[in-house]
Structure formats: structure tokens, C-alpha cells
Amino acid sequence: MPIDCKAKCGNKAALKRPKTGDALCKDCFFAAFEAEIHHTIVSSRLFRRGEKVAVAASGGKDSTVLAHVMKLLNERHDYGLDLVLLSIDEGITGYRDDSLETVKQNRDDYQMPLKILSYEELYGWTMDRIVAQIGRSNNCTFCGVFRRQALDRGAKLLGVDSIATGHNADDIAETVLMNILRGDTARLRRCTNIRTGGGEDSIPRVKPLKYSYEKEIVMYAHYKRLVYFSTECVFAPNAYRGHARAFLKDLEKVRPSVIMDIIYSGEQLRFKDTAKKPVRGICERCGFVSSQQPCKACVLLEGLNRGLPKLGIGKKSKGDRMIAQQNQELALRERANLVKNDF
């Protein structure tokens, strides 16, 4: 027998919220979900009136719900924001080409300007070609580095004040686990931050969905009948994040609140002052923000162009040795050709 909505609106409950366990009707769920995101935006002071904000759009559930809710809240609460969609085409046949059609549908549905940038035009490579050269073991490293910089480049072209990404609570909890497993204290410091970047030379990124459960995002998209692309990236199954995700799901079965517990724990972590912090600067080659010289994107790109795809994988010293070895081999070949020509 259907039970009453916990919000006491007079309707029968249609669902149970994964985050709170409350039985709600659809309308009360929508209201609660949207109100929580509004509270996150306001309490964290993510935006200021008059700002231009790029919504990172992939066509997936997270970015589609983010675009929908951002437009809704911007109008409902009069944020005074100028919203645009920014999408990156990685060049993955059978995945990104199809999802971009969904992004274009979002553009039409929400009446937002759309800018699409491709790896091909930015780097001269597509992910299909990169994977053909390097295999599937490190493809997510290349894609992640290039995508982050591509968003920065697109944001700069659009002249926006910030980039809103669709990272949800599950994503952030997974990232905390990944950084703990890797012993990466530098990233562990900032992975729970709702705002990253910013400053004189970079455009800040914000996460309005930071406290929104992935299951609730799916429910919201389903009951709102939003159009989104649900196919997983064809190169994703081998990603390291998948192991953290599976571990998190197992923990969630035992303790339903584990996602928020991990996020709150990550927010409260303290590190010794002696712990090494990355120093952010400007890449001497591309001119974008980086914590190393040259930046990771430029190193990876150099490796691809040199035929040394593993150049940017691992420690910098390893990459330096690979370049030195290649230069030595080239010098030996040139010397051999000179000797041959003398005869």
C-alpha cells in the first residue's frame, strides 16, 4: 500500500531518496533536490551577479541536470548570471560524436549558447589516434590532462568568469579514495574543494552538485524526462577510478551514508606544514596554468609528436631520460649518414 509523502503535501510517495531515506512524491523530491543545490551555491558563494558562467557540457546525466538546474535556479532566484554551454570533443568514435548531439539538444532546450572545441583543433590529435598509438593502459591520463586544459582554453575564448562542472558527491568521494590509495597528499588537499583554481592567470571551477548523490541525479533526470546520453566511454573500463567506484559501492551497501562521510572526512583532513605543496605557475610553452615546466599537456603532446607516447607517464626524470636517449640515437644516425656520404 502506498505511503504518504514525508513532506506532508497530501500526495502519496513515489520514491525513496537514497541520500536521506525519505519517502517523497515526485514534486517534493524535485523541490528538495533543487533547494539543496541552491543552498550549496548560496552558502559557498559560488557566483556573483553579472558573472558569465560556462557549464561544462558532455551530454551525460550530470552535465544535463546541471544545465537544467542552473537555468532553473538562475531564473527562480534571480542570480543574474549569463550562462553558456562549453563542450569538448575528444574525438572518440561511437561515443563523443553521439553525445554531442545530446549537447546540441540541451542547447536548444535551455536556450543557451554552445561552444564546442575539439582535441583535433587544439592538439592535432584525437583520442582514437592516441589510443591507436599508446594502447588502452594510459589513455585516461592523456584524455584527462587534455580535457582539463581544453576547458581552460574554451573558457578563455568565451571570456567567462568561472566554469561549472557536473562533479557529484560520488565523484568526489571516489577521488578522495583514489588519492588516499595513491598516497597523493597534494591532490588530497584540494579534491574536496568546491572551488578550485582562480587567481590572476586561471579561471576558477566550481561544483554546484558537490553534495548531490549520483543516484538522485539519475532519478531527477528520469522523472523530469530530461534528454541525456547514458553510454559509458568506450575507453573507460580500464580506468583506475573504476576500482575506487566499485569499492565505494561495496561500502555503501554496508553504510549508506559513506559517500557524505568520506567527503566530510576529506574536508577535515589536515597536513603537516612540511608537506610539499605544488607551486602553480604559467607553462612556458602554452601559457596556461601549471605546477610544472613545461605543463603536463605539453609534455604528453611532445611525446606523441616525437613517437614517445610514454614520455609524460610517470616521473619527470624518466621522461628526461627518454628524450636524451632519443636525441642520442638521432645523433648517432646523423653521424652514420655523414660517414656514409663521405664514402
From Swiss-Prot:
Its EC number(s): 2.7.7.-
One Gene Ontology cellular component: cytosol
Example GO BP: tRNA wobble position uridine thiolation
Keywords, ordered alphabetically: Cytoplasm, RNA-binding, Transferase, tRNA processing, tRNA-binding
Keyword Transcription tagged: no
Pathway: tRNA modification; 5-methoxycarbonylmethyl-2-thiouridine-tRNA biosynthesis
Pfam families in the cross-refs: ATP_bind_3, zn-ribbon_14
Domain of life: Eukaryota
InterPro entries given in the database record: CTU1-like_ATP-bd, CTU1_C, Ncs6/Tuc1/Ctu1, Rossmann-like_a/b/a_fold, TilS/TtcA_N, tRNA_thiolation_TtcA_Ctu1, UPF0021_CS
Keyword Metal-binding: no
Enzyme class per UniProt: transferase
SUPFAM superfamilies: Adenine nucleotide alpha hydrolases-like
Gene3D superfamilies assigned to the protein according to its UniProt record, in alphabetical order: HUPs
MF (Gene Ontology): nucleotidyltransferase activity; tRNA binding
Localization per record: Cytoplasm
PANTHER family: ATPASES OF THE PP SUPERFAMILY-RELATED, CYTOPLASMIC TRNA 2-THIOLATION PROTEIN 1
Entries under NCBIfam families matching the protein: TIGR00269 family protein
Family label: Belongs to the TtcA family. CTU1/NCS6/ATPBD3 subfamily.
UniProt function note: Plays a central role in 2-thiolation of mcm(5)S(2)U at tRNA wobble positions of tRNA(Lys), tRNA(Glu) and tRNA(Gln). Directly binds tRNAs and probably acts by catalyzing adenylation of tRNAs, an intermediate required for 2-thiolation. It is unclear whether it acts as a sulfurtransferase that transfers sulfur from thiocarboxylated URM1 onto the uridine of tRNAs at wobble position.
Protein's name in the database: Cytoplasmic tRNA 2-thiolation protein 1
Species this protein is from: Drosophila grimshawi
